Amino acid sequence: MQHTFRLLLISAMAALAVIGCETSLDGNLNENQTPNTSLTIDNIEIDDGNRLSSRVNISWWGDDPDGYVDGYEYAISDTTEGNWRFTTRTDSVFILPISPGEEIEDVLFAVRAIDNEGAADPSAASIEFPLRNSDPVTELNTLELPPDTTFTIASFGWAISDPDGLPTVRSTEIAINDTLNGWVEIPIEAEDQQELFISVDISQEGADEGVADIYLGRNYRDTELQVSGFEFDQLNTFYVRTTDAALATSEIQSHEWYLKRQTSNVLILNDDASSSSLENLVFTRDRLSAIGISSDVIDISDGEGFGSGGVVPLSNAFPRIINPTLNRALAEWDHIYWMSSSLRRNINYAPEILSRFFDNNGTLFFNALSRVQDSSNPLLNFLPIQAYVSIDASRGENGFRIQNNYEVRPASGQGTVLLYNAGRNTGIWPFVPFDEEDALYEAELLKTFITGNLERYEGPSTVAAINPEGNLIFFGIPMIDFMDNGAEGDIEAVLQELLINRLGFSTQQ
């Protein structure tokens, strides 16, 4: 009985084993289905007069029947493999390219979804955009252009834009006097760059035409580029234009200015705004010529009223851009003779505009009437004036006066004595230099009182001094105030001592 049961159990187990070995899944494995893609707008119908700009906002979406969309690929114009770009976005702003030389064009945009298995929509969604190219725009920056007249350093600033977007701008070019063959491309250093600023350093080696090195930006970066066509002692015209990717060109912008040839390494800055300005300039040039010094001249006597701190605004004869333009322009000379009718004029900008000039070992002679200034005036940190001589208001003192035939003597006691010859001047004020040895000339003066009384002044009477560095002399009485028949020789002797012997003025050009 047990034997029979054992046989039946073994037989049942064997049958189950056979059945288990033959069990399997029936049917076919489903293949991956490709995703689908749709554009928000799939057709644009407009007439030619209303064509779109090349800057367009495009959006799309996709779905996948058996998985999910992992991203998208898009192509512009050319949909052959290798021209598709991947993105996970479903919208973006595109600048669609118009073929060079074409004003209007239908540009194809196609997009296809990519699913989680890397399969692409075989029938990508596409649309043709009817486009019209917009011309780029060039605008001059009036604050970054040369003044009416310059010598060999000048700067130019302009802005570029394009209604189709800055990335469509291909180039911007400049020319000097010649718009047929003189164009030079200026580097655009960033895709979103709108403002351009260049400086030119014009060589005078050519007899008739000047060639300039071009420098980029406010930090004066060398480009190894040059532009030619400059004409000395004549009006010159700067031209600038911008071209886009479709080769459309902006309206040409231009600026005209007079270019002077530098003839000397000595510059006269005429800051005399008085009615005698021209007479003073002629007198000064004649005196310099008599001691062998030729000169160039910049007239900075313009400007009406007073701006910040009671100081006249910086002369319009100077470039608006101080650094690098004005700093480098003034540093082209080795010596400057600065004559002025007031200490409230352009001399107040000298520390800033002459920084490169002094770095290049330049020397300055400044000639203006010495008038008392507030002790907080920054000008006193520039001129060789430690302080102005004080007066005793409790006694009714109110100032000083010099008058005809009063002596202006060398502080050392040795040298030429000058005689004042400009009538009565109650505006003069003596000062104290930083060091007693820095004093160069002292004046015979009267002290004035509010009562109208006068008394001879016996105190410190310095009216001319040199700074401790030895590169700046301030002479506090205008040289023309010593002019008299036969006095020219004395004035020239003083200038010989101060300009040539002290400051090293010489003419080498």
Where in the sequence are the language-model features?
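Solvent-exposed loop/turn segments flanking beta-strands in beta-repeat/beta-sandwich domains
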Residues: 63-79, 161-186
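Bacterial Sec-dependent N-terminal signal peptides
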Residues: 14-48, 119, 509
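A glycine-rich, often tryptophan-bearing local segment used as a flexible ligand/cofactor-contacting loop or short
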Residues: 338-428
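Conserved structural position at the C-terminal beta-strand
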Residues: 113, 242-244
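Short beta-strand segments within Ig-like beta-sandwich modules, predominantly Fibronectin type-III
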Residues: 83-92, 185-191, 214-220
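Surface-exposed, short loops/turns at beta-strand junctions within beta-sandwich domains
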Residues: 97-106, 227-234
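Catalytic beta-strand/loop cores that center a nucleophilic Ser/Cys/Thr
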Residues: 397-471, 476-483
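Helical hinge/lid and interdomain linker segments adjacent to catalytic or ligand-binding clefts
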Residues: 276-376
